[in-house]
Amino acid sequence: MKHVMGIPLVLLAAAASLIAQTPTRYHRATIKPSIARVAPGGQQRFKAVILATRLMAAQAPKSVKWSVNDIPGGNAQVGTIGADGLYRAPLNIPVPNEVSVRGEVEGSANRYVWGTVLVGAAEPAYKVVGGWSEDVGTKEARMREPHGISIDKDGNLLIADQRAGRIFRYTKAGKFLGEIGNGPGSEEGQFTEPRYAHVDSAGNIYTTDLKGDRPRLQVFSPDGKFLRIFGEKGILPGRILRGHGLWFDSKGRLYATDVDNMRVSIFEPGGKFLSAFGKDGPEAADFNAPHGLYLDANDDVFVNSYYGPTKKFDPEGQYLFSFAHGDPPDGSVFFHSITGDHRGNAYLTVRTKAGYDGAVESNRGRKVSIAKYNNNGDFVCNISMSVPEHTESWATVDTDGTIYSLFKSKVKAGVEILKQQ
């Protein structure tokens, strides 16, 4: 038997084969093209590629399972896609339309890749289909300065109100259901300036509290009972100065943005600190006041900096790319929050420096509240609320793609409901 440095050659070959077949964070796939425009009845071929890495050229994956709008192979309504990646749009598909193409890639560190098909010449459009509000400053109004919105395990809305020092629960239709925790204060289960609430797979509610002597992360049961505190004030690893956004990965680990420490911290569900990534600085992977975050089905992490851009990282915090730089010719754009859907799309809430009257104007003359991008950072469309003026907003996306967008104007505070037309 042949040997190399005392090791049987057959064992070296077996080890090399195993390494080649084991996906690492370097064996990432991408989709080409990542966005395409077709006419009704038109077609577009997509392909998945395993990216080149050190001493390894780009290569085709062993197999790709294609779907259209989550339907394997697609159908006559949304279009079909073959094993060769050729998408065919129906001749009678309504326009404008946005179609999601997904490839499940064998042997890739990121299991899924998503591409976007824009059908027709116009930009995809969202329509306000409902909503509700309270009159700001009245005795009946509970909300004073609503800040963050999410959906709990029962499909109800959780709204963090920084000025009221409370986290409210409403039905999607606006019926008040109660509060999370014990109201304003700095004791356990109380809030000073709550920013956001997010639920884990069991329905437990995790919250960020921003200012005061005790910025921290708190955990409550699904029915709102206090459970524990972690991530208290400080600059050391595992500590928080100004918590803002939260999200869970597929393993149940909690990711939390820290605006002032300029990083993302990762915790076990019980609160044990695991690791962190990011820092203040001018480099590509550095942050500039990180506010919100969203994890897709690959556990890739999207982090929006308030001053831009938004950055995408792999699950270990390795930088991938940036998008949404916020530098239009007519002035700066500020990105307050980010959320996402199950098709890997990212939704950024935006405004200009002028606040109420500073909404970003779209090319259709409407004020933009949300900018939608696909998983690869390609711009998809602008989304406008019917509220003409509002401060910084936050949005959440339901499993069916419905957007619930939180707002506060000079006289109203509430939620608008939007669906893609």
Which functions belong to the PLM regions below?
Residues 1-8:
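Bacterial N-terminal signal peptides that target proteins for export
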Residues 10-20:
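Hydrophobic h-region of N-terminal signal peptides that target proteins for export
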Residues 21-55, 108-127, 131:
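Short S/T/G/P-enriched beta-strand
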Residues 55-74, 114:
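Short, well-ordered beta-strand segments
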Residues 68-88:
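Low-complexity "stalk/linker" and mucin-like segments enriched in Ser/Thr/Pro/Ala/Gly
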Residues 82-96, 186:
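Extracellular/luminal low-complexity segments enriched in Ser/Thr/Pro
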Residues 95-107:
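A short beta-strand micro-motif common to beta-rich folds, especially ectodomain repeats
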Residues 120-421:
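Eukaryotic scaffold repeat domains enriched in small/polar residues
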